[in-house]
Each structure stands twice: as structure tokens, then as C-alpha cells.
Amino acid sequence: MFNLDNPFWNTVSKLCDLVILNLLFVACCIPVITIGSSITALYVVMRKKIRNEGSSVVKEFFKAFKDNFKQATIIWLILLPLGLLTIYEMYLMTWVELSSLAIIKYVFFSFLIVWILIVSYVFPVAGRFDNSIIGTFKNALLMSIYHLFPWSILIVGVNLLPWFLIFSASGLKLIYIQVMCWIGFTIGAGINSFIFEKIFQKYIDAKEESN
């Protein structure tokens, strides 16, 4: 019963790792400015977990957080104001009923879609490949478009579903928030990590063949 190598305790250990990782991620996102490096570290650790690599979740998270802090923070500080500005402009336009603004609304909506795609890809890409900030943005955008159906749509769906549930289900709002705070982010990152590994491996194999 207390054999730590049996399936039951292995499952308990993995669940504990997911909870610890989720709590670390949430705590490190609180300063806001560190959200980019926190997302990157989350995906780095989740990739190692699904590949059965690495050891301590805490050690691996803070190592990835530190290693990617500069680049991921710069990327986040570029994306954050762009996203907020786009959402704010779209909100203002909902109060204006002018046919002449219809095209502008579509432009902002299209930009928001591109922004969501980039945010969904750029931090996992930053944690997987060594590249410049511009190169990371470029690769994230191209990958998200190239793999739009079905992978990018699925990734975005996994990312947005919890927020949709939180903001749409008032009666269960607190329950959804608690789930996200305890284990929700790691579950989402885990699902997406399987997809990203499938996507990234194609580029890794192609690079190895070219060499």
C-alpha cells in the first residue's frame, strides 16, 4: 500500500507536482510584469513532465523562469499594451453606431485574433528554441497560421475556455476560479504541451536533416 513505486502513489505524486507547479505559476504572475516569464517557465516544466525528464518541479520552474526572464519579459511588455489597447478600442466602438466604423472594427477584431494566436505560441516557442525576440515573434506567428487547423484553434480554445466559464457562469464563478488557482493552468498547459511537442518536433527534425 505504501510502496511509492506503485501506480496509485505515482499518480498522487504527479497530481501534487501539477498543483505545486500551478501555485508557483499563479504566484509568479501576481506582479503582472512577470507573466511572460511565468508562462514560459510553465511550458518548459510541462514539456519535461510529459517527457518524464527533470526532477524537482520547484527547481525546474525557477531555473526556466530565470533563464527566460529577460526575453520573455520584453515579449510580454510588447504584447500587453497592444492587447489592452486593442480591447479598449473595440470596447469604445461598441458604443458608436456608425457604418463608417465597420471596417475599422473588423481591422481591430482581426488584429485581436492575431494577437491571441501570437500570445498562445510565443512563450512556448521562446522556451523551446533559442532565437532573437524578433525571430521568436516571427516563428510564433508563422507556426500559428501554418498549423491553424486544427492545432492552433484547439490551443486557443484550451486557453480561452476557462476564462469564458469564469465570466459567463456567475453561479459557478468562484468554483472555476479556485480550480484555475489550484490546478487549472497546469492542465491547460499540459494539454497544449502535447500539441506543441507534435508541432515543434517537425521543425526540430527538419533542422537535423538539413544539418
Where does each model-flagged region fall?
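Helix-coil boundary and N-terminal low-complexity module in membrane systems
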Residues: 1-108, 115-211
